Amino acid sequence: MEPSALTLTEAAEAYLDHLRDARGCSPHTVSAYSRDLGKLLAWTGSKGPARAADLDKKTLQLFLSGQARALAASSQSRLLACLKGFGRWLMERGLPRNPAQTIAFPRKETKLVSVAGEAFLSEVLDDPGTDEGFEAARTRFCVEMFYGSGLRLSELTGLKWNQIARDGAWARVLGKGSRFRTVPLTDAAKASLDEYRGLCAAKGVATSAGPVLVSARGKPVGNRIIQRTVTDRLHAMGRRGKSSPHVLRHSFATHLLDHGADLMAVKEMLGHASLSTTQKYTHVSMAKLKETYAKAHPRA
């Protein structure tokens, strides 16, 4: 159906269906774009066009100028990426031009990623804790995978038993853009996997297929539960800064680079589509280098 026959709301819903069904975008991406388009629809409800065919550059510029006051630069960039994709989709279906095509991205604020220290993480990983229950074993495995293999939260909660090698040496994970990659497991991760697998088997939970991360009753657990338990573990060990599975992933990448790992190899292990995404970790390593230089060099 041509854009001229669609209301803006109908077009937005059809675009989200396209992302979900034809493009195979992750639920996280579809949800984020749904929120972004929802902002546009709420704004146009009183100030903009009702028909998709009437969406133009001026309308989008006015909308974005209002959003700029409420959103961080990175959120503005994602919002504009959503609008560019939406405009391109409309153009492919008959709109004369992409109304968002020539709108420039805002400059992103340069922020260093949050990283936990190596000594602290060694303490976290070496301390078995006092809780020997099922959830504690699952949390230990999660921490090992986030820091030892650099997984994203959604990649670990989506991991299936049949994606892990029988000897536990590697796992094949499904990342962003529906791209698979193979990641190695550390010896400590393999040991924590064996412990957790044994507890699953003792509870009658299948460990040949199905999701790896489950509750004590064998039900799949989602991102929120794993986020909470890992964050609680880091706090219990004395972490005062930002604490999350993603901090462990940031630490994985930064510590690899600190110890001389090749940037391209780190990019592949993280599952980044672009090298520029991985390069943000070099800023952290450079910051550490400058700090070391300032403390150690007699002329600094």
Each predicted region: which residue ranges?
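Conserved catalytic core of the tyrosine transesterase superfamily
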Residues: M1-A300
